[in-house]
UniProtKB/Swiss-Prot annotation:
Superkingdom to which the source organism belongs: Eukaryota
Protein name: Coiled-coil domain-containing protein 172
Coiled coil regions, renumbered to chain: 24-97, 128-191
Family: Belongs to the CCDC172 family.
Keyword Hydrolase: no
Localization (cell): Cytoplasm; Cell projection, Cilium
Keywords from the named record: Cell projection, Coiled coil, Cytoplasm
Any one GO CC term of the record: cytoplasm
Subunit structure, interactors included: May interact with TEKT2.
Length: 267
């Protein structure tokens, strides 16, 4: 193979090295972009986790409060049932007393009237009896008013329980939405990690290319052949070109550059 053809191959190899450097830059740029995306996704995930934990804490507090209110509601309902039963009993007793009182009043008035007609006794006792009966009826009416007020209070408490149940449903819906967002962020993080691993593998493949590239191997064999034929000057020139080519094909790593700069010159 002529020296001119060899130089043409070296130039072609330099073009390949430039293409490899371009690919390496693109790979590094893509890795940087993916790392930024992973970092942002991780930060977003952390923020969403904090928000979700806060919402869960609030929901737990509201649930605990709701359970307490339910317990109170059950107690109030039992008390309401007892009050209603007692009210019905009292109303029945009141009605019976009213009927009995009316009958007794009519009978007593008739007896007093008859007795008065017979013996002409004053009617003050009749008036006093009526006043006592009216006072008893007023007491019964007052008890009925107290029962009605207690029933209205129970109805107001039930309205508050309905409002808390509505708030619980809204918090559960918001929790479901946050869980969906969290799943999307986890999927994006997994995808970004897979892309990063692929790019790292591509970077390793490009770094190892000079050791397995057929063109580099062939050039080294030709250098060995020239060295065997004692072509010292041609050998040194080709050796310098090969060193430059290997440097061009190798990844631009500061540690690699430092190690190459301390290697002894080839003879």
């Amino acid at each position: 193979m002529s020296l001119e053809s060899l130089f043409q191959h070296i130039i072609f190899s330099e073009h390949q090295a430039e293409e490899s450097r371009r690919v390496m830059r693109e790979v590094r740029s893509e890795i940087t972009r993916c790392r930024g995306k992973i970092k942002k996704a991780t930060e977003d995930l952390s923020e969403e986790k904090i928000k979700l934990e806060s919402k869960v804490q609030q929901l737990s507090e509201k649930s605990f409060l709701l359970e307490l209110l339910k317990t109170h509601e059950n107690a109030l309902e039992r008390q309401l049932s007892e009050i209603i039963s007692e009210r019905d009993t009292l109303l029945q007793a009141c009605e019976a007393i009213k009927n009995k009182t009316t009958e007794e009043e009519e009978r007593f008035i008739k007896e007093i009237t008859d007795f008065n007609d017979n013996y002409e006794i004053t009617k003050k006792r009749d008036t006093l009896m009526k006043e006592n009966i009216e006072m008893e009826m007023a007491d019964l009416d007052s008890q009925a008013d107290v029962l009605r007020r207690e029933m209205k209070s129970v109805e107001r408490n039930r309205g508050q329980l309905w409002e808390l149940q509505k708030l619980k449903n809204e918090l559960l819906q918001e929790l479901f939405t946050l869980q969906k967002k969290l799943k999307v962020l986890k999927d994006e993080e997994t995808e970004a990690i897979c892309i990063t691993k692929q790019l790292e593998a591509e970077k390793t493949k490009v770094r190892d290319k000079p050791q397995h590239d057929p063109e580099c191997v062939r050039l080294k064999r030709e250098l060995d052949l020239y060295k065997a034929e004692d072509m010292e000057s041609v050998y040194r020139a080709l050796q310098a070109e090969v060193d430059l080519l290997e440097l061009a094909l190798a990844p631009k790593d500061p540690q690699d550059s430092n190690s190459l700069s301390h290697e002894p010159p080839h003879t």
